[in-house]
Amino acid sequence: MALVLKISGRVFDNEELVLKYAEILNKLPGRIAVVAGGGEVARRYIAVARKGGASNTFQDLLGIYASRLNALLLISLLKDAYAKVPRNMEEFLEAWGRSRIVVTGGFQPGQSTATVAALVAEAVRAAALLNAANIDAVYSDDPRKNPNATRLSELKYDEFERILRSSNLPGGYELIDTWAVSILKRSCITTYIFDGRTPEAIEAVVRGENPGSKITC
């Protein structure tokens, strides 16, 4: 059984949390693909580039390289991981054919790491995509601004798409983009969204539990 784990870049802003993820991934059985976000390094570099007038494409490249640096850090902590960070799908598939664990970051400008994770999950026919996010579950609205937002333990992709497209959700309500959702939906890949600060949730999913929100076709 193959799993894909998307780790929010914010996880990499916490050294102890990164070490805990590595500890858990080293213990997990089966095959695992991990996609790392860019985190504070990406935000800082992009902010400077934007201030200096760099193009959006160049800003995206900075985010991609930051995510690859985070991926390389995780690789250094894993026992069975492929030693290089794949830069595109072809390189990822080559690595996947050789190693039990493959860790990657962004692939190309204009494409989120969430979309990379969805494409990877589709390519390896993953049993599920696990999204270690900046929020503990999917809500009907942004719970940080709307105290009446409802926590949704289980939902379908159609409902999830409606929530993501809601005008009430600000950019800071980071879950996954609609392009990534469309990929997961077309291949009917189950997605789990949980709090990235609790890496133990990965083990919970493997045990058949739902630590946050479960999204299905």
Curated annotation (Swiss-Prot):
Localisation: Cytoplasm
Record comment: activity regulation: Inhibited by UTP.
InterPro entries listed in its UniProt record: AceGlu_kinase-like_sf, Asp/Glu/Uridylate_kinase, Uridylate_kinase, Uridylate_kinase_arch/spir
Binding site for ATP: K6, I7, S8, G9, R10, G39, R43, N134, Y139, D142
Top-level enzyme category: transferase
Catalytic activity: UMP + ATP = UDP + ADP
GO BP of this protein: 'de novo' CTP biosynthetic process; UDP biosynthetic process
EC number from the UniProt entry: 2.7.4.22
UniProt pathway annotation: Pyrimidine metabolism; CTP biosynthesis via de novo pathway; UDP from UMP (UMPK route): step 1/1
Keywords carried by this UniProt record: ATP-binding, Cytoplasm, Kinase, Nucleotide-binding, Pyrimidine biosynthesis, Transferase
Molecular functions (GO terms): ATP binding; UMP kinase activity
Residues annotated to bind UMP: G38, D60, F107, Q108, P109, G110, Q111, S112, T113
Annotated GO CC locations: cytoplasm
Family from the record: Belongs to the UMP kinase family.
Subunit structure: Homohexamer.
Role, per record: Catalyzes the reversible phosphorylation of UMP to UDP.
HAMAP family referenced in this protein's UniProt entry, alphabetically: PyrH_A (MF_01220_A)
Protein name: Uridylate kinase
